[in-house]
Amino acid sequence: MKAVYPGSFDPITYGHLDIVNRALKIFEELWIVVMSNPRKSPVFTVEERVEMISDLVKKEPNVHVDSYQGLLVDYLRSRNIKVVIRGLRAVTDFQYELEMAIANKSMCKEFETVFLMTDERFSFLSSGLVREVASMGGDVTKWVPPNVAEALEKLRSKGKQFML
């Protein structure tokens, strides 16, 4: 069975990768889909995020990385995928994710959302926190893979403003 793990991944963190690894224990094939979110001002372009994630999962033959702008249900239909994976850190995540799952289900009854609890080591971690700490020159290497930490430092050294 195939599943989609959608998100903005701006940037991808070890918390996201924990969800990827655990989803692979349940599903035969996983599509990580970088979604364009009009409510967010990303630090990295969609293409940069796809490239960073692709580098991280290149040794996983059953993981594919893609991008999409539009409704998630349309992407699922186009790939004939019926399951969405969502990671949860806390109760506050659950409220938002539940609303999204219900909205997706109302648009297409055949789709299911599977919630995976984030490992407790990453329960505090968010892309926003990573961006905030990195923008001030802080060490984020415990929270993101080396290629992501390097990309963040490169942006900071060029004076790019990180939107929080």
UniProtKB/Swiss-Prot annotation:
Keywords: ATP-binding, Coenzyme A biosynthesis, Cytoplasm, Magnesium, Nucleotide-binding, Nucleotidyltransferase, Transferase
GO process terms (BP): coenzyme A biosynthetic process
Places the protein is found: Cytoplasm
Residues at which substrate binds: S8, K40, L72, R86
Pathway linked to the protein: Cofactor biosynthesis; coenzyme A biosynthesis; CoA from (R)-pantothenate: step 4/5
Domain of life (superkingdom): Bacteria
Any one Gene Ontology cellular component term annotated for this protein: cytoplasm
Catalytic activity: (R)-4'-phosphopantetheine + ATP + H(+) = 3'-dephospho-CoA + diphosphate
Record-marked site positions (Transition state stabilizer): H16
Cofactors demanded by this protein: Mg(2+)
EC number: 2.7.7.3
InterPro entries named among the record's database cross-references: Cyt_trans-like, PPAT, Rossmann-like_a/b/a_fold
Binding site for ATP: S8, F9, H16, G87, L88, R89, E97, F122, S123, F124, L125, S126, S127, G128
GO molecular function: ATP binding; pantetheine-phosphate adenylyltransferase activity
Annotated function: Reversibly transfers an adenylyl group from ATP to 4'-phosphopantetheine, yielding dephospho-CoA (dPCoA) and pyrophosphate.
Subunit note: Homohexamer.
Family statement: Belongs to the bacterial CoaD family.
The protein, known as: Phosphopantetheine adenylyltransferase
Gene: coaD
